[in-house]
From Swiss-Prot:
One of its GO terms (biological process) is heme oxidation. CDD domains: HemeO-bac. Induction: Expressed in dark and light. Part of the bphO-bphP operon. This is Heme oxygenase. Catalyzes the opening of the heme ring to form the open-chain tetrapyrrole biliverdin IX with the release of iron and carbon monoxide (CO). It comes from the Bacteria. It catalyses: heme b + 3 reduced [NADPH--hemoprotein reductase] + 3 O2 = biliverdin IXalpha + CO + Fe(2+) + 3 oxidized [NADPH--hemoprotein reductase] + 3 H2O + H(+). InterPro entries: Haem_Oase-like, Haem_Oase-like_multi-hlx.
Amino acid sequence: MMQALGQGHIDADTYAQVLRRHHRLLAGFEEQLSDWLVTLVGSGWQYRRRVPALREDLRVLGQPVDAAVPPPASSEAARWGMLYVIEGSQLGGRVIARMLRKRQPGLAHALHYFELADEDPAGWRRFQAVLEQRLQSAAARADAIAGAQAMFAHFHTCLAAEARP
C-alpha cells in the first residue's frame, strides 16, 4: 500500500486508509508525549503537530478518525530517537503530495498532512543539528537508537494492520 502511495497509484478509499493508519500512529505519539513535545522549543526544536492536518484530510474525505495507538515511552534520549523517525518520515511527504497531485488530482483537497514538509524545507538539517547537541554521550546515542528502533516497529504495526474497534 505504501509503495502504491509513493507512486500515486492509489484510490480514494485506500488513501483514506493510509491517513487513518498514520493518524493512529501520530495521535498516539502526540497525545502520550504532548508535555515533552512542548518543551522541545527550549532545546532549539519546535515540533509541528501532524494530527490536525490528518484530521482535516480525513474530514474532507468524509472518513472516521481511528483511535490512537501510543508508542512505547522511554527515556528522553529514546524519545529523541522516536522523534528522529517521525521527522524523517516527513521527508517523503513532499514526493507523495507531488505524485498524488499529478496522478490523483481528485485527492488534491486532502493533502494537508503530506504537504506539511513544504512549510519548512530546511527543517530536517536543523533537526539533525539539534539532535547532535542533545545526544552527546554514547549512552544517550544508544538510547536514541533503541527509541528509533521502537518507533520503526510502531510504524510497522500501525501501518500494516487495520484498526480494531
